[in-house]
């Protein structure tokens, strides 16, 4: 069985809804076991509240949070993030930055990956 991880970060729910679609499509492939997870949030609740993100995040609060150590158990990845000033979110970046030791150890060699993003407004709003 091929294990696929659809991993996302979202504040407003847009990247979450995209992740649901990616996961649904991947589940249509015979022989694939697909898991949908979110990255651990690194931004404080105070900042999330000021940004208006606490309420929208309730939509996907039930989605399990991924850990770095589980990544080598998957055969493929789809990473989803909103854009922040043209870049991935700092939360997704923080998660991925913690995977360097897997590269050094060769633990993710041969894995397949893709990315998707949501974006919607200018000026970082």
Q: What do these predicted regions represent?
A:
Residues 1-107:
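N-terminal beta1-alpha1-beta2 submodule of the flavodoxin-like/Rossmannoid cofactor-binding fold
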């Amino acid at each position: 069985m091929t294990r696929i991880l659809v991993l996302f970060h979202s504040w407003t729910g847009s990247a979450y809804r995209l992740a649901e679609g990616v996961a649904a499509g991947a589940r249509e492939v015979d022989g694939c076991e697909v898991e949908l997870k979110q990255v651990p949030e690194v931004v404080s609740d105070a900042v999330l509240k000021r940004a208006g993100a606490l309420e929208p995040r309730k939509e996907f609060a039930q989605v399990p949070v991924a850990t770095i150590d589980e990544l080598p158990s998957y055969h493929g990845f789809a990473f989803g993030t909103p854009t922040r000033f043209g870049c991935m979110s700092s939360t997704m970046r923080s998660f991925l930055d913690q995977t360097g030791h897997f590269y050094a150890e060769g633990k993710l060699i041969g894995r397949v990956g893709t990315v998707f993003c949501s974006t919607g407004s200018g000026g970082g709003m």
